[in-house]
Amino acid sequence: MTIRDKNKSAHKLRGFGPIYCINLDGQPERWEYMKEQFDYWEIKNYERISAYDGRDDDLSGIVKGLYPTNITPGEIGCTTSHLKAMKHYLDTSDAPYAIMMEDDCDLDVVRFWNFNWIDVYAYFPYDWDVIQLAIICTGDIHVKLHKRFVNDFSTACYVISRHHAEKLVRLHCRGGYTGKQTYKLDQGVKPRPVADDLVYNSGNTFSIPLLMYKIELGSSIHPEHIGVWHNGSHKALWQYWQQMGSGINIADHMNYDPYLGRVTEATAPPPEPETYPEEGKV
């Protein structure tokens, strides 16, 4: 991102926060990218969370209980970093929700919004736990608010309610202050204790792709996924917001269908209609 003129759309993200941005110590260029975005969008309410790097470090010292065997070291680092961010949020803020963000989140698409963050928050479902704001989907992307599909991937950015963060910290964090705790990942998270499953599958999660991810930064954990899944979702969403953003009715966009994707198909043949003898005949 280069230095640009004053952002005339900065008001759209007024009230967007507190933000807890997860960043590896060994990737300062990503943190510079995020700080430039925050400055451009006039966002002040953010903090950097130093991430655990499971790719190069042995994280067995911070994992309590059985060490997960069905996820990669990088995925363990990602999951524990998100839990660390939640613990820090609860320890240092009394805000009713927090925005968890990874260091490849892209805010540029906000310029296509014809609404603002306060409008979006006003339409959150009454019983929400998590709202996923950035999506990488292996199928068709549903652009309106919806109950999260299992193939709506990415923890690049999501909003988490305080009570759900408290639940996850209670289940998975052990010890005292932020940075000193250990983590339990053997609590039966299905299908695996990766960040997506641990955060989203443990509560009432909705998804709406209001933000994006910086495709040029690649992926620290799954670089092989960029060309397979990330590129397609990114291109489709960018075109959608560029072409359709100015005409969106946010009230309609946030009015989710509670039955979407939640009705089982009938695979058994329908029953034969019952027949009755004509009146007067046996």
Residue ranges: model-predicted function:
Residues 1-101, 105-282:
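An acidic/histidine-cluster motif and surrounding catalytic segment
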